[in-house]
Amino acid sequence: MKIFPAIDLKNGKCVRLTKGDFKSVKIYNENPIHQAEIFSDAGFKYLHIIDLDGALEGNLTNLDVVGKIIKKFNFKVEVGGGIRSEDSIAKLLDLGSDKIILGTAAIKNESFLENCCKKYSGNIALSLDARKNNIAISAWKNQTKIKIFDYLNIVKDYGISRLIYTDIERDGTNTGPNFENSYKIADNFNIPLLISGGISSINDVNKIIIDDKKIEGIIVGKAIYENKIKLEIAALHLVAAWNVFTHQSHEKHVLETRRRMSKVTDFITVSKEKSKSK
């Protein structure tokens, strides 16, 4: 299973919201590049980046920061937030993004989603962000009457490469994800699915693995930033997954993870010392 640590960008900083409420914004790192470095050194292979300013304004706003992260680190990065045109998609793919996340533009215009899936085959992810099964758009500020499963039945054959389902009422709350809806999506639609919103502990991760519902992975935000899920534990879950898929030595992967975690500890120590000296 893939674990995507999340970096949400606002005013060039790494932040988290609660239930998508911009009044609840909390800064976790002034420097998103440093945050990406922490995730990279911990051994994560995937990264979820959302441009919150872009989502609000309807265009790419933090493109420079996104580009620097992609260029500096060896993540497979999925990027979303304010992507409403093919020009924006092309720019992000040129930077090296692995997946482009469409939300508002896709919900408003199904033909746009279909055309993008054809033109950028394998690169388009669809974000389904909902309150009580009704999809929300425009940085989650506008609630539609469109039901998740009704919409999926329309677009299921477009060639979407990934679905991202977020229960907005759980996002940033550390109360656990909406397993019921997540599993229903996984069971009824043959599209790789990432679960987002409310992942609270390693127990949530274990449940998804044990339940074996064809989930591609999870997106984790506040639970990692607030040490509900410790980096080293999440990384060890990745080790187990790599072992299953590559049939390589588990001991070898554990040693590699410990080496990387040592680098993370050193990095955090140096960062704290630098902060004290300022």
PLM feature spans:
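Hydrophobic faces of well-ordered beta-strands that scaffold small-molecule active sites
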Residues: I3-L9, L47-I49, V77-G81, I100-L102, ...
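Conserved anion-binding
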Residues: G12-K23, S97-D171
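Glycine-rich, proline-tolerant flexible connector loops at the mouths of alpha/beta enzymes
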Residues: Y46-D64, T104, Y165-T175
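Charged helix-capping and loop-helix junction motifs
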Residues: L60-G67, E110, K141-D150, T175-K184
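Glycine/small-residue-rich loop that forms an oxyanion/phosphate-binding "nest" at active or ligand-binding sites
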Residues: T61-C116
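Catalytic cores of alpha/beta
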Residues: V77-G96, E180-S182, A186-K214
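Glycine-rich phosphate-binding active-site loops on the catalytic face of alpha/beta enzymes
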Residues: I83, D94-F112, E169, G197-S201, ...
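C-terminal helical cap(s) of enzyme catalytic domains, especially alpha/beta-barrels
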Residues: F112-K119, N206-D211, V220, I224-L238, ...
